[in-house]
């Protein structure tokens, strides 16, 4: 007979093949990283999986961290539909759901696990179909941005007197997803995930957001680039996010592994998509044929609640010189240093700094146009990779596990060879302050103030202000 059970009583026993066992409620009494470590041991079939790095005092402290309490409430809100034994199904699904929530590349705007999960009779496979309704309403004044996302690059210069104020709302971000969680003798724990939402053309058309598979240390599919550190990004209600981050989704194959509980390394081969400003007369963009390569090395402490990461990106950008009838390959690269620091159990600090040449299509602001390769001044038929620099500073404070606030300050700067002295983008500034309230584990509301500025090389500038309100239901 089919039955439905709630995960309100959490009981997890994670056992490696040498019988190293985590006690009940281990995911709560250890940080996100500790749980992830246990799961990776299971997926890899590791011979030894020790939790000696977390003493009783540290575990007790981590159990009170608001993020862990919040994750516990999310997992509690998932119901099981299956024909197996209730206790076995509950334990198995809770362990599988941890792989869903404890993810290096999980974004703060990603949907929560489905409200209902179907469990196989063997309790080794769970599948759920979920949805997310997200409505944002916003009001711009003293200059408005003509798009839903708050992007400083899109601030009009000069101000349009017919659009000094703007009231609008968007369902962009509303969507559906399917996830499959399971365990196999050879693969270990695995996950498949497909997500679509209505953030396509005009903010309403259906768009594929993610489609990937994970098994052990491997990920393959359409997923977040390895160059991005989502955990170091302060959360925003605004869909665009801080303009200084590097954010992109690519078709990729990634390997990621953690050593001795402190170090994580990852590398990926990612299918390219360059953005080249060829004029079609003297220069022409060539098809991409060399994959982008991304990697990072990360050191974590405080049970994984804090980390510092160095990320790198390498790519080849190809164009044709129409005057000399020759193709040229330009090397593009990017470096990023990012961190999240848990200064107090309820207080987090965030920081990101990046620099590169020819990586502009990975940034938030400069991806709005073609900046990977631009015209070389004074040399017809030649292109080069300009430099761009970005940074993000942020903080987050939990008043309670269900009420928290974020602040974010960000800048993106563009450095061409020569000062063009025209209306070309020079830098953009972005600021956000918000407040979130989880009324229930699946119903969230929030409000946010946004301020932005765009400065051009000819010293003309524009600014914009926005108040955004959001409500979100995940099911």
Regions found by a protein language model. Give the residues of each.
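Bacterial Sec-dependent N-terminal signal peptides
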Residues: 1-61
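N-terminal periplasmic/intermembrane-space "pro-region" immediately following the signal or transit peptide
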Residues: 23, 27, 55-141
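Outer membrane beta-barrel
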Residues: 120-149, 161-274, 289, 294, ...
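Sequence/structural signature of outer-membrane beta-barrel proteins
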Residues: 140, 183, 197-203, 227-229, ...
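Surface-exposed loop/turn segments flanking beta-strands in extracellular/periplasmic regions
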Residues: 148-158, 371-377
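Detector for outer-membrane/organellar transmembrane beta-barrel domains
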Residues: 299-419, 425
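Outer-membrane beta-barrel "beta-signal"
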Residues: 437-439, 463-475
């Amino acid at each position: 007979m089919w039955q439905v059970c709630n995960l309100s009583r959490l009981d997890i026993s994670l056992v490696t093949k040498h019988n190293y066992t985590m006690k009940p409620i281990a995911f709560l009494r250890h940080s996100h990283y500790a749980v992830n470590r246990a799961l990776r041991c299971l997926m890899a079939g590791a011979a030894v999986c020790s939790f000696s790095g977390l003493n009783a005092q540290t575990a007790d402290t981590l159990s009170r961290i608001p993020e862990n309490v919040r994750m516990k409430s999310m997992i509690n809100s998932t119901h099981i539909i299956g024909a197996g034994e209730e206790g076995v199904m509950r334990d198995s699904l809770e362990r599988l759901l941890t792989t869903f929530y404890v993810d290096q590349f999980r974004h703060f705007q990603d949907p929560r696990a489905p409200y209902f999960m179907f469990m196989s009779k063997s309790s080794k496979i769970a599948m759920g179909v979920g949805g997310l309704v997200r409505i944002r309403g916003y009001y711009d004044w003293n200059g408005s941005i003509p798009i839903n996302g708050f992007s400083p690059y899109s601030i009009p210069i000069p101000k349009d007197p017919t659009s000094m104020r703007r009231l609008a709302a968007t369902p962009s971000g509303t969507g559906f997803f399917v996830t499959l969680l399971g365990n196999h003798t050879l693969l270990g724990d695995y996950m498949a995930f497909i997500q679509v939402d209505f953030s396509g053309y005009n903010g309403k058309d259906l768009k594929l957001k993610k489609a990937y598979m994970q098994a052990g240390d491997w990920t393959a599919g359409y997923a977040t680039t390895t160059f991005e550190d989502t955990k170091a990004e302060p959360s925003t209600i605004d869909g665009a996010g801080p303009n200084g981050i590097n954010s992109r989704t690519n078709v990729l194959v990634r390997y990621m592994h953690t050593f001795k509980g402190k170090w994580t390394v990852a590398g990926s081969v990612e299918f390219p998509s360059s953005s080249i400003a060829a004029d079609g007369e003297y220069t022409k963009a060539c098809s991409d044929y060399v994959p982008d390569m991304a990697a990072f090395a990360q050191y974590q402490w405080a049970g994984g609640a804090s980390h510092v990461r160095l990320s790198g990106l390498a790519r080849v950008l190809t164009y044709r010189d129409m005057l000399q009838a020759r193709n040229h390959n330009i090397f593009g690269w990017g470096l990023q240093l990012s961190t999240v620091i848990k200064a107090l159990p309820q207080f987090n600090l965030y920081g990101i700094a990046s620099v590169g040449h020819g990586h502009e299509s990975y940034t938030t602001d400069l991806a709005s146009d073609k900046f990977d390769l631009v015209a070389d001044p004074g040399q017809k038929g030649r292109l080069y990779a300009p430099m761009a620099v970005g940074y993000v500073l942020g903080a987050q404070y939990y008043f309670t596990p269900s009420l928290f606030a974020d602040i974010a300050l960000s800048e993106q700067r563009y450095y061409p060879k020569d000062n063009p002295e025209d209306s070309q983008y020079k830098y953009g500034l972005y600021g956000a302050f918000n407040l979130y309230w989880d009324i229930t584990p699946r119903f969230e509301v929030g409000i946010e103030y946004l301020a932005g500025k765009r400065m051009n090389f000819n010293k003309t500038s524009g600014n914009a202000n926005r108040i955004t309100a959001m409500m979100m239901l995940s099911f």
